[in-house]
């Protein structure tokens, strides 16, 4: 803590202040000299961090002497700007501004090693500027105490004022150790000056005391006479009851009108002890009937006056010490910032930019990690898709293009067996496991690969079961879900010479794309057209049935074999899953006496079916539906059922007795062909394995 070392008797303007000394104004009659000890700012006795000190020395050596001189100079505006931002107490801010102005005017080295110039420029002494170690201690040891000091100051919650600048501080408090603290910080000269009591000041304190305790007139007069004896205006020998021992240690100067009090600490403590009940509080009526009692009242007032003076000095000392510390630490902080800015200017990069670069680098690393994760997930999905479709898409498309070209060349030639120009290799192999299972065919992407290929059935194609129950007994009409007919190869029996042929009479233009194959392959197209053309297609179905009955003769065998009554004629009714009713007639004839074996017929048909067998493979890349999807979609119910009369069923069964006799043989062959189809397409449709097991079980 600062000490009071001297008294400015001739005025503070004439006093030779040394380093770290400032004047302390007590009252109109007293001004003391306040000094901060050297150990407060010891720049050599601190143990510094070796790494940080080495780094600071390197930065200090980077600056030239001229740049260092400029960096070690800050204006008053910078210091006071930091003051307004950091110090909330109004009294502290005003005290700092006042002290800085006094130092600018006087030029005293009060802030050593800081120096205040006449133009308000704050700088550092040359000895400290050239010594990097001292400068480091000043900036990073003492300069770091600014925030701690400001935070340690108690503040009022109402107006943010500190206790030293609060209005309550000026009121006298009960006696404590504060007077002893300030008494020990004073030099002997200061103590002698403190105990020199002015007579007029003591009289004011005495009158206040008499009014406060409501002395009567006689007692009041007694106290005033005791005061006059003390200052030497009355002769004490003429006063009856006067006690000279009470005024021992007190000496008056009548010419100068002041009183000298003994400087011994015990005597001061005795005087202040008399005044202690007064500061404890309470007003009471007092009396002084005799002179000795009046002398004690005068000593009490002397103790009150002395205590108030010591309390005022203690308060001024603490406030000025706090003001000096604030100004010193604010100046050090401003100089440190100026030095760091100069070093950063030389380095070309600031600490803030370094921090921003660190944040940017962290952000880049984070984004890189996220990008790697996204790429990893993308590769995982890609590998999963490759595993599901092992055949490359481009190879499949090239194969489909080649097959489409072959189909186009083949369909240009007419069917030699029956003279029809319909496509002979578009028959679809389907096995119907039970009456509730709907037929399914490959997607339209491969089946109808070229727009020039006609849509229709094979000339060797006949329907199996035609949507009826497999049993001879109890044949019932099937619903729309179960009446989807699978156009399969080799149902019809033909001669070896190919005389018996099935001519497909359905006109493409008239049917508007409703052929047998299209009811399987173009199920999505018929979905979009079904609602708009429902009535039109119903009429087309009836028309197609009538044409089939009238043109039944064209489906007969050659004339030599027509005498037999075993002619077989069956009609296939194809019903779409999307409630579009398609009626296709496909007829075949066989001789009851001379029927070709089933395997011979399949041998002939396979010559046409094998070249384009790969073209029937569904194209998974073009949105075609698999066999399972088509079968699942065929499960939908239909609000409109197309029934076949019982007479037609009985007539069909009577005319096709030979078909029913060879029924198991036909079924076995269909299973073999379907198994062969699934094996050929097993690499594209792994799900066919499940259908193979299901078909075998059924």
Swiss-Prot record:
GO cellular component: cytoplasm; nucleus
GO BP: any one term: spermatogenesis
InterPro entries hit by this protein: GGNBP2
Cellular compartments annotated: Cytoplasm
Domain of life: Eukaryota
Primary residence: cytoplasm
Annotated stretches, region: Disordered: 555-575
Keyword line: Cytoplasm, Developmental protein, Differentiation, Spermatogenesis
Function: May be involved in spermatogenesis.
Database matches in PANTHER family: GAMETOGENETIN-BINDING PROTEIN 2
Name by which UniProt lists this protein: Gametogenetin-binding protein 2
């Amino acid at each position: 803590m600062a000490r009071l070392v001297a008294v400015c008797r001739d005025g503070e303007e004439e006093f030779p202040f040394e380093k770290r000394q400032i004047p302390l104004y007590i009252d109109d009659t007293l001004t003391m000299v306040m000094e901060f000890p050297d150990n407060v700012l010891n720049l050599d006795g601190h143990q510094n961090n070796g790494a940080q000190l080495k780094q600071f020395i390197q930065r200090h050596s980077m600056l030239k002497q001229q740049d260092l001189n400029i960096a070690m100079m800050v204006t008053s505006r910078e210091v006071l700007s930091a003051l307004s931002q950091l110090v909330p107490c109004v009294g502290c801010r005003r005290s700092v501004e006042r002290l800085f102005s006094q130092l600018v005017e006087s030029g005293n080295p009060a802030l050593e090693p800081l120096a205040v110039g006449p133009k308000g420029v704050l700088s550092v002494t040359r000895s400290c500027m050239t010594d990097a170690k001292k400068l480091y201690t000043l900036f990073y040891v003492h300069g770091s105490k600014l925030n701690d000091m400001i935070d340690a100051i108690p503040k009022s919650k109402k107006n943010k004022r500190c206790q030293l600048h609060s209005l309550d501080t000026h009121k006298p408090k009960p006696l404590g150790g504060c007077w002893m603290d300030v008494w020990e910080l004073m030099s002997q000269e200061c103590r002698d000056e403190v105990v020199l009591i002015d007579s007029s000041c003591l009289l004011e304190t005495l009158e206040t005391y008499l009014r406060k305790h409501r002395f009567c007139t006689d007692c009041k007069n007694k106290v005033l006479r005791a005061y006059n004896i003390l200052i030497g205006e009355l002769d004490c020998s003429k006063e009856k009851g006067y006690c000279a021992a009470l005024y021992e240690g007190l000496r008056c100067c009548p010419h100068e009108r002041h009183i000298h009090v003994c400087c011994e600490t015990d005597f001061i403590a005795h005087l202040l002890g008399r005044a202690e009940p007064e500061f404890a509080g309470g007003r009471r009526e007092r009396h002084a009937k005799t002179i000795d009692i009046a002398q004690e009242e005068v000593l009490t007032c002397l103790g009150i006056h002395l205590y108030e003076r010591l309390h005022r000095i203690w308060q001024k000392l603490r406030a000025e010490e706090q003001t000096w510390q604030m100004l010193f630490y604010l100046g050090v902080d401003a100089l440190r910032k100026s030095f760091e800015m100069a070093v950063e200017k030389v380095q070309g990069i600031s600490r803030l930019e370094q921090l921003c670069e660190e944040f940017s680098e962290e952000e880049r690393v984070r984004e890189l990690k996220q990008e790697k994760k996204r790429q990893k997930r993308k590769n995982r999905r890609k590998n999963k898709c490759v595993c599901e479709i092992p055949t490359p898409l481009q190879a499949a498309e090239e194969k489909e293009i080649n097959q489409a070209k072959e189909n186009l060349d083949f369909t240009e030639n007419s069917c030699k067996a029956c003279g029809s120009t319909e496509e002979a290799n578009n028959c679809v192999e389907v096995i119907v496991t039970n009456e509730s299972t709907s037929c399914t065919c490959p997607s339209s992407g491969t089946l109808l690969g070229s727009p020039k290929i006609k849509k229709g059935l094979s000339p060797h194609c006949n329907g199996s079961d035609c949507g009826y129950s497999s049993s001879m007994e109890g044949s019932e009409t099937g619903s729309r879900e179960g009446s989807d007919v699978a156009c399969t190869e080799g149902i019809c029996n033909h001669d070896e010479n190919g005389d018996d042929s099935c001519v497909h009479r359905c006109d493409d233009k008239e049917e508007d794309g409703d052929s047998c194959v299209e009811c399987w392959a173009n199920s999505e197209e018929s979905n979009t057209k079904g609602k708009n053309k429902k009535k039109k297609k119903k009429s087309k179905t009836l028309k197609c049935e009538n044409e089939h009955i009238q043109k039944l003769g064209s489906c007969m065998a050659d004339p030599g074999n027509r005498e037999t009554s075993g002619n077989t004629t069956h009609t296939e009714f194809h019903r779409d899953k999307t409630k579009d009713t398609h009626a296709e007639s496909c007829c075949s004839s066989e001789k009851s006496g001379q029927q070709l074996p089933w395997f011979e017929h399949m041998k002939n048909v396979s010559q046409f079916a094998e070249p384009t067998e790969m073209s029937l493979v569904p194209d998974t890349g073009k949105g075609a539906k698999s066999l399972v999807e088509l079968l699942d979609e065929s499960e939908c119910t239909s609000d409109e059922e197309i029934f076949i009369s019982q007479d037609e069923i009985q007539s069909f069964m009577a005319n096709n007795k030979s078909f029913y006799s060879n029924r198991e043989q036909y079924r076995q062959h269909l299973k073999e062909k379907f198994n062969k189809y699934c094996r050929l397409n097993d690499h594209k449709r792994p799900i066919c394995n499940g259908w193979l097991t299901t078909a075998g079980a059924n």
